[in-house]
Amino acid sequence: MKSAVMAVACAAAPGLRRPSAFNGAALTTSAKSSSAMKMSFESEIGAQAPLGFWDPLGLLADADQDGFERLRYVEVKHGRIAMLAIAGHLTQQNARLPGMLSNSANLSFADMPNGVAALSKIPPAGLAQIFAFIGFLELAVMKNVEGSFPGDFTLGGNPFGASWDAMSEETQASKRAIELNNGRAAQMGILALMVHEELNNKPYVINDLVGASYTFN
């Protein structure tokens, strides 16, 4: 083992002694390019108060504009899903549909628990329908308009298109920034609800803080 390590070290040594001018120039050019790209990302929507440009994992360190837009597309989509999840969580806590969810399983909507616990109650056929619907959305609905901003899923038409087009560019940018912030908060929020549900079956921490009692599942 020691011999193998020494052999690798000796083989690498010539490259460590004297870096060529070409390599140095390439590194300098690469550093300048990365710095320029980072500066361009700092002016993108989403680099805003209170954190500004925040990339602790370095996902954009070597990204080009296409890479950035791919990540932004994913962020917007996940944010929208998380906002729907928060709304669904709160709705399920306070209201249930009437009738039966599954006659074969003798399961009514009122019998379904809220949150993560619902996954263990949904019949296999129901889970299959959910995954099929998600696949349909992914393949046919949530497709970005070519040449538009990340998150523009209006290929099939936009019922609010007229009001959106009537807005100024500044207003449109503000709306997109608000959606990003709300989506980020919702992603953290739904994660917190799931964690606290698993910890003590009391996901609504704010209710506990203000003394508002509730029964969860």
Curated annotation (Swiss-Prot):
Q: Quaternary state and partners of this protein?
A: The LHC complex of chromophytic algae is composed of fucoxanthin, chlorophyll A and C bound non-covalently by fucoxanthin chlorophyll proteins (FCPs). The ratio of pigments in this LHC is; fucoxanthin: chlorophyll C: chlorophyll A; (0.6-1): (0.1-0.3): (1).
Keyword RNA-binding recorded: no
Cite the residue span of the transit peptide. 1-39
- What InterPro entries has UniProt attached to this entry? Chloro_AB-bd_pln (IPR001344), Chloroa_b-bind (IPR022796)
Q: What is the recorded name of this protein?
A: Fucoxanthin-chlorophyll a-c binding protein A, chloroplastic
Where it sits in the cell: the answer is: Plastid, Chloroplast thylakoid membrane
Pfam families, per the entry: Chloroa_b-bind (PF00504)
Q: Which organism is it from?
A: Macrocystis pyrifera
Which terms under GO biological process does the entry name? photosynthesis, light harvesting
From the broadest rank down, the organism's phylogenetic lineage runs: Eukaryota, Sar, Stramenopiles, Ochrophyta, PX clade
Question: What function does this protein fulfil?
Answer: The light-harvesting complex (LHC) functions as a light receptor, it captures and delivers excitation energy to photosystems with which it is closely associated. Energy is transferred from the carotenoid and chlorophyll C (or B) to chlorophyll A and the photosynthetic reaction centers where it is used to synthesize ATP and reducing power.
Kindly give the Gene3D superfamilies that the UniProt entry links to this protein.
Chlorophyll a/b binding protein domain
Q: Which signals induce this protein? A: Levels are increased twofold when transferred from high to low blue or white light.
By sequence similarity, the record places it as follows: Belongs to the fucoxanthin chlorophyll protein family.
Q: Which domain of life is it from?
A: Eukaryota
